Amino acid sequence: MGDPFGYEAWQGHFELPCLNLRNPEVRQYLFDSIQFWVDNFNIDGIRLDCANVLDFGFMKELREKTSAMKPDFWLMGEVIHGEYNRWVNPEMLHSVTNYELHKALYSGHNDHNYFEIAHNVRRLEAVEDRFTPLWTTTTRTGSQVN
């Protein structure tokens, strides 16, 4: 059984405890919390921090549950890098952050390196052609970026 006084933390940040998403009671608590916000505040969606480390099974169930709560409910995930289509698909998230493009826009503009911007936009357009219409919902500039 493990230490009853200890817990796992996200990347060693103990103010961010890891939730046991394999536990059905924990999952249901999260779904009930979202239902509360939908019922009382008519929210249209949520943003999942660090979606790239969340269990895909959980995100699939989250998509199913939130779509039942509100058909147009929006799920957006923070994904730093990778094959974004692993997260953006009809079973999981509607969109993800796109820090790769944000970096190209930010540094390319500041350094007057417009080749960097053009290269990254062309690269994303090539990927987008394969995954349209899902990819088009990708956030073009990341959030929480200084």
Predicted features, each with a name:
Residues G12-R27, D44-V53, H102-D111, R140-N146:
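The substrate-binding groove and active-site-proximal loops of carbohydrate-active enzymes
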Residues M1-L21, Q35:
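Aromatic- and acidic-residue-enriched carbohydrate-binding clefts of CAZyme catalytic domains
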Residues S33-Q35, D39, D49-F131:
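Active-site-proximal helices and loops of the catalytic beta/alpha 8
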Residues R122-N146:
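Active-site-proximal substrate-binding groove within the catalytic cores of carbohydrate-active enzymes
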Residues R22, E78, E100, W135-T138:
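Structured loops at beta-to-helix junctions and adjacent beta-edge loops in soluble globular domains
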Residues F41-N42, L134:
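Short loop/turn motifs at secondary-structure junctions
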Residues R22-N40:
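Short, acidic/polar
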